[in-house]
Amino acid sequence: MDDDVDAGEIYAVDRQREEGSASAAAFSRSPSTGRVDDDDDDLLTYGRSARRMAALPAPAMPEGTELRRPVGGDVVGDDDYLRFLYKFKELFDRVGIKLPTIEVRYKNLNVEAESYVGSRGLPTILNTYANILKGLANTLHMTTRSKQKISVLHNASGIIKPHRMTLLLGSPGSGKTSLLLALAGTLPSTVKVSGMITYNGHTMDKFIPQRSAAYVSQHDLHMAELTVRETINFSAKCQGVGHHYDLFLELLRREEEENITPDPETDIYLKAATTGEEKAEIVTNHILKILRLDICADTIVGDNMLRGISGGQKRCLDAHTAPNVDSAAEMLVTLGRALFMDEISNGLDSSTTFQIVNTIQQTIHVLGGTAVIALLQPAPETYELFDDIILLSDGQVVYSGPRDHVLEFFKSLGFKCLERIGVADFLQEVTSRKDQKQYWIHGDDTYRYIPVTVIAEAFQCFHVGQAIRSELAIPFDNSKSHIAALKTSKHGVNLKKILKANIDREILLLKRKSFLYIFNALQLTLVAIIAMSVFIHTNMHHDSIENGRMYMGVQFFGTLAIMFKGLAEMGAALANLPVFFKQRDLLFYPAWTYSLPSWIIKTPISFLNTIIWVSITYYVIGFDPNIERCFRQFLVLFVMSEAICGLFRFIAALTRHPVVASTVSEFCILIVMVSSGFILSRDEVKKWLIWEYWTSPLMYALNALAVNEFLSPSWNEALPGFREPLGRLVLESRGVFPEAKWYWIGLGALLGYVLLFNILYTICLSILTLLKRNVREMSQETLQIKLENLTGYDQEPSSGGRVTNDKRYTEGGNNDEATSSNANHNSSPARKGSILPFVPVYMTFEDIRYSIDMPKALKVQGMAGSRLELLKDLSGSFRPGVLTALMGISGAGKTTLLDVLAGRKTSGHIHGNITVSGYPKKQETFSRVSGYCEQNDIHSPNLTVYESLMFSAWLRLPAEIDSMARKRFIDEFMELVELFPLKDALVGLLGLSGLSTEQRKRLTIAVELVANPSIIFMDEPTSGLDARAAAIVMRTVRNIVDMGRTVVCTIHQPSIDIFESFDELFLMKRGGEAIYVGPLGQHSCELIKYFESIEGVRKIKHGYNPSTWMLEVTCTLQEQITGVNFTQVYKNSELYRRNKNLIKELSTPHDGSSDLLFPTKYSQTFVIQCLACLWKQRLSYWRNPPYIAVNFFFTVVIALLFGTMFWGVGRKRQSQQALLSAMGSMYSTCFTLGVQNSSSVQPVVNIERTVFYRERASHMYSPLPYALGQVVVELPYIFLQTLIYGVIVYSMMGYEWTCTKFFWYMFFMYFTLSYFTFYGMMAAGLTPNYTMSSIVSTTFYAIWHLFSGFLIPKTRIPIWWRWYYWICPVAWTINGLVTSQFGDVDDKFDNGVRVSDFVESYFGYNLDLLWVAAMAVVSFAILFAILFGFSLKLFNFQKR
């Protein structure tokens, strides 16, 4: 048995399996446990049978005993699984119980959406504001709608019957996903739906569609920190047998009545499906084995930044964490479940796809399930597993019926599938205008394009279409619907168990993220120590009102420090929202069972943070020593922390966007801070804004803290000339209610806010949906092609931007010219691209080994060694003009090998020799001549397709290539991969907006091709593409190879034609070992000859796909059956020796050759890199309304709010308190706007950073030009923000209108916002994710607050901390603002002191040193910008 571990996987060694009597013995020895729901009514109704079920023994089998392994197992094969299914069904048949089934009907189903067409759909700042105004005008019926209606599905009709597998085919964009969503009842409310959909004759309002059907999305959404086992286990715990319990109960009752002895194997399985806590574990293990995920069960799922399982394994995981499919009971005993699965084969090899589909097919056929599965490139053997076909094209159903009649239908239209072309490929191409002609059987002279609408109409006249129409006319007999088929309850498990599952997961996530919380606590400890030493009790006395205000300042600072620490909660909440919305919509759980654990489980963190703060600061600073008052302070701060965390969670759920959430959160911090009663006392708040004071949680916290402290015995002494105690005077001077009851009022209000914010959080989670564009903006070219395919006529855009029919060809006309030109276009080589020179290179690698540090999970399991080896002694060569396929089952290590060879690994240990053209590989030069198409399509979301290609070509093509040649080169490859219709389409974020999956894949390929590389690595270039698009891509790749380039591709599901377009094959098996490296030969003859010569390997069938056969005969199961170690067979072969000789020959430089050498490190100069990066950032920012537009909106709101709250404060100079209020306005405004800029820019940096990692690995540019581009693009937006804010606030606050004072105000605000923005960039650059950057930055926000000069003047800062005052950027901002506005004012206060003298004596500000403050703020902006650049240069947080 092979104990090795795959790339990205942790291998869980399979336990020995026992059968028959061992299973029965395990059952008899298992302890007793309760069933899912203990219902006394069942006991009364069913008597002894119910008691048997109520005390079902949990099938907790001893080690070495498991449920039978279904298809794809290491021991038990397809026949065993099928036998098990028949045996299971026999349980019900022999007692006369009919299993529930579902028949889905849809009639005249139409789905329409509205979308902007062309540039109007780009999310620019102007378009965003225009859309808002347009929406308001539409609401008031002042204007007409400018969106264009798009028909997604048109008059779709059909019947999906039980016991039959239905394959949904269609090119991307044809409406497959919309049809599946409509049938599953999960279409978004933003689209218009008409027509009828019924389940067993019942409309969807009569049952719960999400519980009666399961939709599996094509996008992988999982919590990256959880392991595969934990992900499936959670899914299993949230699902249940539900109504099927009664069905099983009836089965047992009838068995007892008829004295039938249960079969041990099926009886164990039945009990596993109906027991309580043990069910999830058994179900999880079963699913892991069904999907071949047991080898990576204890590996975290991972994401783009966190290394985890492979892409194919994620697809398997996604396919079986959908509701109703995730438990073994529901997978094997579908019992009336309707499955709708969307492109589940993406990233899977053809063998794994076949095994999974075969498992589903056997289940559907035997147990009467209903399934519709959309596949893009099904292999012929996978295609044969289906009974029915639904073929969509441009929203039209062109065929829906038995698979046996589909070729007959198209033959009646004059089309025939060609030899060696898969039927599925033929069906997807025959409706395409560019591919239809090749299948015409009556000669080219008679051909004219038959549009989609004509084919759809012809199907209605075909006998299959007529039969469906006739059957739909007869209503379904509702009496035939099984009572257990359609679910009327929302959840399959009682809410108590669902809540427990969420609590367990939340605790698990808390442990996985413990470093973040520990780091957060350590930083709070640091801030507390600093505050303690600044406000040390030896400098803090209880002898004056001024010192009393200092103590209130400490309390204010403490609340701010704890409040800023709560910001980390928002980042964590945002990160989990996509997974939450997916699981909520699929009815895994109600929102409250998610929100309650996320609140309660985090409570100890708030408790710990509060203890840290109070224990460090309380007694050292000199608060009242009474232990009760210490506890009271702790209680207020703890409850306030809980309220603030609830507020930030609520903001995250409300905004659902990291950038918008950051902006809104800072706005809320501003409101609660300014309205707290500290910056402006209650007496100074305007009457019309007093509501803000009464609604601020911070006000209640400060009131409670102040009353607790200043009504204590420590403040009971009266000052000379006053009768009232000093503490009472302090409270009255700041407008605090001097009554003891206000402690309890404040605490009660905070508790109310805790409940309010968490209730609002739950409500938002319950009613809102994930922010995404349900209908992507459509380019005019795309809409034009869609209409041309539908009608057969050329389309012309009207003057208003709408595409209208232009009948350039009559119905009887011949459009051979257009069609033939398209056909020629598709097959033409890259003639224009070939004019660009390149240096052919070849690569050899010998004895490559790659290992990582042993994961903790495996150490716990007892695996020895300090490292885990993922690649083992791999050797091979890639040569110019040779197209090499790198293949193996999912998780074999293909991507890992590509990463190692391309130099993309950022961690782990690599051993072995790699040469390029005979010389040792140097990564810097190799990156210049290589391209890497990554499996994850990572692009800048706010660029268009053409701009993305332009940026890549601009920075990667040699500097001597002029712009016109570069443009021609780009256009050539856009034509080759058919991106011209998408030229002006926005790339967007995967799964949320912009391009579809297959469009992004083509863009990924084009981005690398336009760099004109000599050697290209392609990781699954055809994954996510339909057969036609895959053929286009591979045709393009073949053309590139024929030019003399070296290309190696990992590929999963090649058709025969695509597979045989490769020249050589590098085949790997699990464990990272090679089992075949050599030529394919004509019709794969060399490959077939090699494997058929091995004893025990079955012969390939005639017409069978060699790639599928190859994976089948070399799988782990076959190795165990035949006893053949394919790795050892290869190493003992003559082929291996020939390869070693070839590697030895190619590893030596040829005579007259020279090593790769470039005069410069990058293709373009530093200046060009800066210009290109600035060009890209300018476009990205202009199309980023959540960042720019929202920022401007809140800037205006904050300016008006502050101007109102501090109205005329600049003219009030009659008292020191008035000046302090003016200073408070400056302090709060610069901090609020600054922190808003700093926080909102961090998600922007993080989103683009994944793209930056890819581009830097390609040596497109140095990190410094990238950083400079992002810094410079901010400057005009900051200037506009400063201008908007400055003009509003300066005039409303009544500062003196002189050119000098206004200039200095704008100057300091501009550079303050600049250094805050650049600080946010730097924080993001120095940390791995948004949550961590929030923790780091908020720590410095708190310290800057402390040393800003407002809470404690410079003159009163202890000498040992005064040095930090000089390096605190905010201190220089406050210095500059106060000095420029009041440093030259000769007016006197009521006590006779001049304003300028007070500014100098109290604050230590000197007008003569104003230029120093100006230089300081400029220096900080430059410093943070430089540090941002170096953070990108020095740190790489991508784990690969």
Swiss-Prot record:
Biased composition (Polar residues): 812-829
Residues given in the record as ATP 2 binding sites: 888-895
Organism listed in the record: Oryza sativa subsp. japonica
Repeat keyword on record: yes
Its job: May be a general defense protein.
Transmembrane segments: 516-536, 561-581, 603-623, 634-654, 659-679, 688-708, 745-765, 1188-1208, 1219-1236, 1271-1291, 1302-1322, 1332-1352, 1357-1377, 1410-1430
Chain ranges of the ABC transmembrane type-2 domain: 497-710, 1168-1382
Protein name: ABC transporter G family member 46
GO molecular function: ABC-type transporter activity; ATP binding; ATP hydrolysis activity
Cited PROSITE patterns: ABC_TRANSPORTER_2 (PS50893)
Domain of life: Eukaryota
One Pfam family per UniProt: ABC2_membrane
Residues annotated as binding ATP 1: 170-177
GO cellular component: membrane
Main localization, broad class: membrane
